[in-house]
Structures are given as structure tokens and as C-alpha cells.
Amino acid sequence: VCFLIGGSQQWNGTQIPLYLSIITFLLTCFMIPALPNSFNEIRGNGELFPLNGPMWSLFFEYIGNILYALFIRRLNTKRLTIVVIFLFIAHSIFTIGNLSGYGTIGVGWTFDSVNFFGGMIRMLFPFSLGMLISRRFKAIKISYPFLLSSILLIVIFCVPYLAPIKDINFNGIYEEICITIIF
């Protein structure tokens, strides 16, 4: 609706016919992504889901659930640990090494090689790590857990983008610490 109200235009000003907006809407309802430069990539930005940008995350979560149902759940704890270590290394290299070129792990929203690969790693590492934690979890008593969690979230959300200094991607290091340890 917002795309139609906004004039049905791509970023470069190209007018999009109503029938393409309707087709794109229907494809989005069925979680069928748009490939870059395809007819249903109506906003001209290369997004997987042009009418609902954040839906890329749900798309990768569905892929994760399919992989879980077919393969990951069958791994014993030792093999899952090996998978998590491999994914941690891949995730760290991608994030700290700034393979996306964005200076952030903000990838996965399009089908280009960097974004799709990055989106898969971005989903698979925390997903597999969460499974490993759930298998090995031993509850401990913490005083004031809500207060401590709230303070921690406020502190980490107040950290701005950390610019690179002499080819060291400080923002990537910060994001890797947040994803791996804090979250």
C-alpha cells in the first residue's frame, strides 16, 4: 500500500505498472523472493522482497528450519560442536574481515553472492550455537536478571557505528562480540 501511495516508482524514478505491484505482492505472500533485475524486483534496489524489506530475515529463518528438520537435528552434540566452531570461524572472518564491504554484518537482503552467503552465515551460526547451548545448558541463579539484561541492552544499543582505523574493522569486532557472547 505504501509503495502504491508513494507513486509506484523505483529509486531511479521509473514508474511501475499496477499489475507488477500485484504480482510482486502475491509472490511475497508465498515467500517467493525476487532476483536482482527480475520483473518482480519493482523497487530497483535488488531486495529479496521489495514490498516487505525485512522479510529477508524470515526467508533465511525458513531455510534454517528446513536445514534443521533435514540435517542439523540429527547431529550428536560432538558433531554439532564441530559445526558451530566452523560456523563461528566463518562468521568471524565475514564480520571482522568486512567481507561485505559495508563495515557491518547487515547482509542477507539481496541475492548477490556476498549478501546471500553472508545471510546464510548470519543465520546458521547463531541458530546452531543456540541449539548447542540448549543441549548443554545448566541453569544458574542470577539476582535481578531483568534489570541486568535491561542495562546490558541499553549499553550495547548506545554504542554508535565504530569506524575502521588503519584497516581494523572495529565495528565488525564489536558486532562479533555482541552476536557471539552477549546475545
What are these model-derived regions, one by one?
Residues 1, 20-181:
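Aromatic-enriched alpha-helical transmembrane segments of multi-pass intramembrane proteins
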Residues 2-16:
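Helix-to-loop transition at the C-terminal end of transmembrane segments
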